[in-house]
Amino acid sequence: MTIAKIQKYLEEVALLNNASSLAHWDMETMMPSGAIESRAELLSYLEGKVHHLLTSKKYSSLLESAKKSKLNTLEKKLLKELLWDHQLTSALPAKHVEELSHARTMTTHIWAKARKNNDWDMYYPHLQKLIDLKKRESTYFKSKTPYDAHIRQFDKNFTAADISKIFSELKKGLTKLAKEVNADGRFVKIKDLKAPFAVEPQVELSKYITGIFGLEADKSRLDISTHPFSTTIAPNDFRITTRYNEKDLDSFGSTMHEVGHALYEAGLPRDKWNGTPFGEALSLSVHESQSRFWENIVGRSQEFSSFIHPKMKELFPTQMKGVTPEKLFLMMNKSVPNLIRVESCELYYNLHVIIRFEIEEMIFNQGLDAFDIPYMWNELYEKYLGVRPKTHAEGAMQDSHWAGAAFGYFPTYTLGNLISGSLYQKMKKEIKTFNQDIERGEFSRILTYLRENIHSKGRAIEVSDIIGGEIRTKDYLDYLKEKFDV
């Protein structure tokens, strides 16, 4: 009965979080810019209210009562996750939560304007305020380093030292692979499709992808935002965004990525566990594994290139003239270093993440100020990728994450890639028609596997249950070697 009481108590928290999600989505897609101050106040209030409910004496009493109750194995796991969340939330003063929320909302708004105008001077004082707030936040937690306090908010199983070790190993493997791919030349010399690409057929392609991957139209929306994102407003209300540019087809990849996130959210067992950890994603690393899986392992595969080829010819007849499925596959996986993370190929993508990880570590553990981030950013891009940004918009202002105070999030992209690589190796053995299904455009078997083994489990499982062991680099590197045929 105690667990049932906890679930009942958390219903109000879930509703408040729904309201926050809707307000965030509206802010990024529809809200008039003049409303930003009132929106910041609203979000600060809602997040403060949630914090109050989760740190109240009543809720603490319910958790204490559950600890003394006779629970089955599943309930014990749920309680463990509830206690972990309570520990994190209780460590933060209410005033800090509200102040951070307000600053985060305002900074995100300013970031969008500053990015458009390539104006770091407009942006960095607000970013520095967020950094100072997050540095203060790290003092509320017991962690080995200040940066660890932020990493564990997105994936509790890792520290900066753990990630650094994994990234070091991955860097070596990627460097070796890049040399082999460059020597082979096929994925380097291939020319891009010729622009321009009208927005209307891009929108049609995005909607087509959303449908064939399995996201239900009556429970989802596709809109436009400065930076693509996915959010869940409530059970059966999943919102994704992308962005369109007539100079390229990057909306193709970003839509597949965000659909992957939304499919995970749509498969969570909210009918039974809404508002509890079991109704939530296992971690942000696992969340990113799902988006990267659909974007890359499915969406950039040779089989998918064959499947999508007729649709591409229909929507972009001039650009696709003379382009075979094999050529399209090479184009979709063109492997040259670039400046923009979300536009990067798989071979170099993780280096973009590693750069951000190293800068975040410098910010929190070594005292790097916001003013100096562009210099360090440009130096690391030249060191790791051999390219140097000419503008802040294509440099340190390209992502919205830091403006949203999501320090510690970036490593989850690469951890997600590694999980997706292991998942691919496992699924190929268990779904004998894996490649054929993709080539035929039949994704139901793949989605069902993900629903049964990951989505429907929420936080009731561990990563090892998904991939048969710890997160490792080998499976992902093997997947890339297979794809690039080197």
What do the PLM-derived regions correspond to, one by one?
Residues F167, K171-L174, V199-V203, I209, ...:
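All-alpha helical catalytic cores of prenyl diphosphate-utilizing isoprenoid enzymes
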Residues S21, G34, S38, H52-T55, ...:
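C-terminal, non-catalytic "cap/extension" segments appended to globular domains
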